[in-house]
């Protein structure tokens, strides 16, 4: 990982079998869209998210039925589970009792001190962290009265207020988010938060929109934040299938060199020289490599003259021409293949290289 694009001196916090912060890799999160009390549907969606590359998943816990479902859900999934709690501290206690890995609350809206203390004590006993979720759209009244409207300073003040509540109870396994739907506000809030405290930061642009618009908005905002070395976990919030959130998050992290085990596709824009159906081929290959957990780079290019040289960093690739294609590795042509079989030949080569990479990774783990 490139240290230039990684926030250092961040307090490490355990979430299930993962460690957030410190010098650990940035983690991708998402949230289910199912009713949490529907265990079968929720587990099915979580498994889809996990297959797509989600590393932590959050579920809404609006009532007792949802809280009671936590234990059954936990038994059937492999990634850490987070409970999203508002107002009722008893739901947090039930979720903790059910084996939840992290609780997302705002201590200030849980109620009197004894209620917050009950949640903190239960979390402390189980070694469960608490995420303080600051949102520009739901800042406390006294902060809005002080600043007049949601500001980055107001959001940081809110975060510090909630942090102090937990610290006064000798609780320090804290993660903080500073979400806003306004991109510039979110960027400023995260920058100021990173200077104000050393707890891990969960990144997000809230209510960013539909698949297309939300992807652009999230990439603009979160990309600016990531470029400053800020962020320890991340969720892309979209009005879409949550699997799409994970796909966008993976691509965003790959763009900054922050996803060590993810396949990357290199493909050229179309032009008048192209003799193959580049767009459909690129989409097919992208889908094929989307679940690979190795850092393979694959190229799909339309020009057999310049293609291999332009994608010399690719582990494997094809460059199309009329009726045939060039299969190349690291910029050097391996062989010519007929157009009708070049995608299948590329997939075979991808499988071989991916298997080699996975084997090497396993050997490195055993040697450590």
Swiss-Prot record:
Biological process terms in GO annotation: isopentenyl diphosphate biosynthetic process, methylerythritol 4-phosphate pathway; terpenoid biosynthetic process
SUPFAM superfamilies: Dihydropteroate synthetase-like, Nitrite and sulphite reductase 4Fe-4S domain-like
InterPro entries, alphabetized: Dihydropteroate_synth-like_sf, IspG_bac, IspG_bac-typ, NO2/SO3_Rdtase_4Fe4S_sf
Gene Ontology terms, MF aspect: 4 iron, 4 sulfur cluster binding; 4-hydroxy-3-methylbut-2-en-1-yl diphosphate synthase activity (ferredoxin); 4-hydroxy-3-methylbut-2-enyl-diphosphate synthase activity (flavodoxin); iron ion binding
Pathway recorded for this protein: Isoprenoid biosynthesis; isopentenyl diphosphate biosynthesis via DXP pathway; isopentenyl diphosphate from 1-deoxy-D-xylulose 5-phosphate: step 5/6
Domain of life: Bacteria
Signal peptide: none
Cofactor stoichiometry and binding remark: Binds 1 [4Fe-4S] cluster.
Binding site for [4Fe-4S] cluster: 268, 271, 303, 310
Keywords: 4Fe-4S, Iron, Iron-sulfur, Isoprene biosynthesis, Metal-binding, Oxidoreductase
Catalytic activity reported: (2E)-4-hydroxy-3-methylbut-2-enyl diphosphate + oxidized [flavodoxin] + H2O + 2 H(+) = 2-C-methyl-D-erythritol 2,4-cyclic diphosphate + reduced [flavodoxin]
Presence of keyword Manganese: no
Enzyme class name: oxidoreductase
EC number: 1.17.7.3
Required cofactor names: [4Fe-4S] cluster
Pfam families assigned: GcpE
Protein function: Converts 2C-methyl-D-erythritol 2,4-cyclodiphosphate (ME-2,4cPP) into 1-hydroxy-2-methyl-2-(E)-butenyl 4-diphosphate.
Family per record: Belongs to the IspG family.
Name this protein carries in UniProt: 4-hydroxy-3-methylbut-2-en-1-yl diphosphate synthase (flavodoxin)
High-level lineage: Bacteria, Bacillati, Bacillota, Bacilli, Bacillales
Name of the gene encoding the protein in the UniProt record: ispG
């Amino acid at each position: 990982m490139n240290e230039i694009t990684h926030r250092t001196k961040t307090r490490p916090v355990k979430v299930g079998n993962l460690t957030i912060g410190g010098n650990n890799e940035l983690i991708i999160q998402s949230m289910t869209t199912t009713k949490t009390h529907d265990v079968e549907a929720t587990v099915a969606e979580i498994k889809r998210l996990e297959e797509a590359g989600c590393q932590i998943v959050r579920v809404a816990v609006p009532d007792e039925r949802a809280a009671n479902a936590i234990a059954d859900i936990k038994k059937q999934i492999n990634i850490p589970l987070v409970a999203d709690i508002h107002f009722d501290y008893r739901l947090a206690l039930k979720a903790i009792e059910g084996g939840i890995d992290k609780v997302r609350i705002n201590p200030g809206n849980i109620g009197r001190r004894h209620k917050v203390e009950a949640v903190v004590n239960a979390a402390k006993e189980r070694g469960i962290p608490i995420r303080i979720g600051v949102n520009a759209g739901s800042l406390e009244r006294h902060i809005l009265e002080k600043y007049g409207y949601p500001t980055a300073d107001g959001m940081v003040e809110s975060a510090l207020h909630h942090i102090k509540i937990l610290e006064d109870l000798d609780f320090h396994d804290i993660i903080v988010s500073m979400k806003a739907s306004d991109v510039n506000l979110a960027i400023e809030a995260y920058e100021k938060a990173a200077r104000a405290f050393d707890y891990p930061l969960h990144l997000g642009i809230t209510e960013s929109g539909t698949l297309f618009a939300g992807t652009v908005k999230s990439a603009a905002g979160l990309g600016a934040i990531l470029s400053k070395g800020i962020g320890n976990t991340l969720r892309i919030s979209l009005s879409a299938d949550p699997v799409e959130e994970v796909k966008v998050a993976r691509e965003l992290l790959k763009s900054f060199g922050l996803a060590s085990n993810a396949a990357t596709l290199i493909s050229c824009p179309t032009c008048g020289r192209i003799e193959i159906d580049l767009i459909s081929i690129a989409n097919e290959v992208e889908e094929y490599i989307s679940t690979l957990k190795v850092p393979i780079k694959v190229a799909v290019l339309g020009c057999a003259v310049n293609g291999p040289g332009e994608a010399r960093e690719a582990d494997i690739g094809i460059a199309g021409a009329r009726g045939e294609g060039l299969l190349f590795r690291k910029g050097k042509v391996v062989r010519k293949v007929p157009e009708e079989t070049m995608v299948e030949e590329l997939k075979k080569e991808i499988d071989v290289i991916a298997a080699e990479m996975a084997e090497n990774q396993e050997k490195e783990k055993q040697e450590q």
